[in-house]
């Protein structure tokens, strides 16, 4: 059985518009270079809620809640060529997107 090589790209961001634009840019670049792309697959959103007392002494009922949502996407590039890897390395993505690349 022939083993195929693939690149797994994980994207994380607090802004869903930035992560979708970056994923679209990666997919277009990989397809233009001749690779097959699976994804972007949206992963569950991690929602962290912080509750803060806004009163310095009494009035425990006076609170504010803040939330932070972390959006995640994953995509696989199947059988990447050297041209594909070079094109992905030269790609300039938004500053608010965390990119992790694994070679499998």
Curated annotation (Swiss-Prot):
Q: Which keywords describe this protein according to UniProt?
A: Ribonucleoprotein, Ribosomal protein
Cross-referenced SMART domains: Ribosomal_S10
Q: Which GO terms describe its cellular component?
A: ribonucleoprotein complex; ribosome
Asked if the record carries the keyword Amino-acid biosynthesis, the reply is: no
InterPro entries xrefs: Ribosomal_uS10, Ribosomal_uS10_dom, Ribosomal_uS10_dom_sf
Superkingdom as given in the UniProt entry? Bacteria
Pfam families this protein is in? Answer: Ribosomal_S10 (PF00338)
GO terms for biological process?
Answer: translation
The protein's GO terms of the molecular function aspect are: structural constituent of ribosome; tRNA binding
State whether keyword Ribonucleoprotein applies: yes
**Reported function:** Involved in the binding of tRNA to the ribosomes.
> Which family is this sequence assigned to?
Belongs to the universal ribosomal protein uS10 family.
Subunit annotation: Part of the 30S ribosomal subunit.
Instruction: Spell out the protein name for this chain.
Output: Small ribosomal subunit protein uS10
Q: Which organism is it from?
A: Dichelobacter nodosus (strain VCS1703A)
């Amino acid at each position: 059985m022939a083993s195929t090589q693939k690149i797994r790209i994980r994207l994380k961001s607090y802004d869903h518009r930035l992560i979708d634009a970056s994923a679209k840019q990666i997919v277009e670049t990989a397809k233009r270079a001749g690779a097959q792309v699976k994804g972007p697959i949206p992963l569950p959103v991690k929602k962290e809620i912080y509750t803060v007392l806004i009163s310095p002494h009494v009035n425990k009922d006076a609170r504010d809640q803040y939330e932070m949502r972390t959006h995640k996407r994953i995509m696989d590039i199947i059988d990447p060529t050297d041209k594909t890897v070079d094109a992905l390395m030269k790609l300039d993505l938004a500053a608010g997107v965390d990119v992790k690349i694994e070679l499998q």
